[in-house]
Amino acid sequence: MKLRVYLSLFSALAILTVSTGCIISHCTTPAAGGAPAAAVRPGLEQELKKDVLYLAKTCHPRPAGYEKNQARAVQYIARSLSESGAAVTYQPFTADKRTFVNVSAVFPGKSAKRVIVGAHYDTCGSTPGADDNASGVAGLLALGRMLKGISPHDTIELIAYANEEPPYFGTEQMGSAQHAQKLYTEQIGVKAMICLEMIGYFSDRENSQSYPAAGMGALYPDKGDFIAIVGNWDSVRLARTVQKNMQSFLPTVRLNLPEIKGMCMDFSDHRNFWAKDLPAVMITDTSFFRNPNYHQPGDLPETLDYRRMAQVVRGRDLGLVLKRLQRYDLFFIRQNFSAFFLHFTCFFFEFG
């Protein structure tokens, strides 16, 4: 009897160990390193810097309520996206009796189902918002230039959002919440959503990177020299696809977890697509877990690393992410991970 109990306990421990390893592998991939960074398109760094400077200087400040500066930003974004050959439209909506605008650029594909890339253009208060989030918008505009003349399989929508920052964060007045609801109401299929949220701040200093939970430092680097891909359970395959393309350009880490309060997993526009059970990931330099200038007057264009920012955007190869998404069923992981736990539970109780 004791032998059977010991064998059961030993087997359960072994299964738990293997399961833990599978879960860790499922949730995270350590930073990719060792290979030299691949080259990016000449001139990309300068284009990114030009866009950041315009948004953070000419349009400063651009929070909700600063209508003239937000209008400048909207016009600049729309003009740049129009030059890419996309069909550009404004998506106005009302919050607190004021009108706000999302700027949408659609590249029609053979399939009506959409791959969406979004970035918010507003700032928190009177901060310059170079990293948060002129960097993300600059990446969005660069992607528009890369897609010029391309005939995609899936319809691609690039969209610049209003109202990501307070006082509208977490409300239905976020531009991305309005957009997600519009897609739902119009029954437009969404294959994936990629959110560009702060992609320009990097550090090679030791202990320059922090994390939302104790123990995460054992899995992730202590230097802020990587880009992160953040997703929930439904977005594992999407996150892996994005990481696969990006890791030849710079170190990347991936985190896929349930939406746990306090983990800061949903601190941008992708949250509103998760709320609709759509696969979405955030590409980020990890915000205040690395950048000391977050929501501060020091969030200036000169603090950004445009070389590594260009590697995030990666010239032509960010377009490859969109192409590779055509080959995947993005709900595969959700179904199979549920099956994994079902099989584990049945095996445990059967053996015990």
Model features per residue range: what roles?
Residues 35-42, 58-68, 91-94, 123-133, ...:
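Second-shell loop/turn segments in exported
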Residues 43, 47-50, 54, 68, ...:
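Extracytoplasmic/secreted proteins, especially bacterial periplasmic and envelope-associated proteins
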Residues 124-237, 265:
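Acidic/histidine-rich catalytic neighborhood of metal-dependent amide-processing enzymes
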